[in-house]
């Protein structure tokens, strides 16, 4: 870190020396600000680090510094751009330092229509990695069955990734984002600007307290994503059901069976049509001369569709 002119106090360390690179992929999901990776000239080397960055969609989120033969006359420290090949004369004694970079806003018209990489979104500095991952986000957007127009609530919006990507797909939607975490509102607003979209409202606070005070135009949602709620999730779902527009739908990603067991009866009691599924994805990670599939956390998805009213 002295060679890079950067303090080391906030740095994390990880050894891949002769090891499976899977722990590196897991650590990258936490989005450390600085990560020193002890590498190996064979297995667990700089190429495995680069492959892990690509597989995680974070290649542009980190500056990769290759440090060779430190403290010797042949010492060499250089930054490798994503498009730059690994040096053919790589010294066997080397390590890699990854430094998080503030990413420039990508041109909105150059982004893909669907399935944005995780690295596109700015994240909470105190909880990096706390966002809906791309694979889950794609599934949630499909489950929301987005209408061309209407009101979409994203409750417990986090970085705003799901709601904002929905707004790119359906620009005529009125999007309401509510996030309780401090700094959530400016973060979502910044991500909206990066994606070239404009939510109808972004609120910072407890959803249970914010919903009763919504303007009339946003008071009856056509689609709702509940990404948070914690211990209040049952009461929050009950309030959503009371406010749902005719033919409305609610989608709830869950981490535990207990949460599913708590919320599913609430939808059934309201005569909602209920669907339960699980999203499980794997990402390719380097393994020796090949590729292994590293599992991501499974997510349960609970979906409820409001009962049709007579004549609907």
Language model: regions and residue ranges:
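Class I SAM-dependent methyltransferase SAM-binding "motif I" and its flanking Rossmann-like core
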Residues: 1-31, 208, 269-294, 298, ...
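A contiguous loop/helix-start segment that scaffolds small-molecule binding in enzyme catalytic cores
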Residues: 33-128
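Active-site capping/gating segments
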Residues: 71-95, 259-261, 266-310
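Conserved class I S-adenosyl-L-methionine
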Residues: 149-158
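Conserved SAM-binding loop of SAM-dependent methyltransferases across substrates and taxa
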Residues: 159-171
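Helix-to-beta-strand junctions that scaffold the AdoMet/dcAdoMet cofactor pocket
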Residues: 170, 244-246
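Short beta-strand element of Class I
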Residues: 172-176
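S-adenosyl-L-methionine
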Residues: 178-220, 232
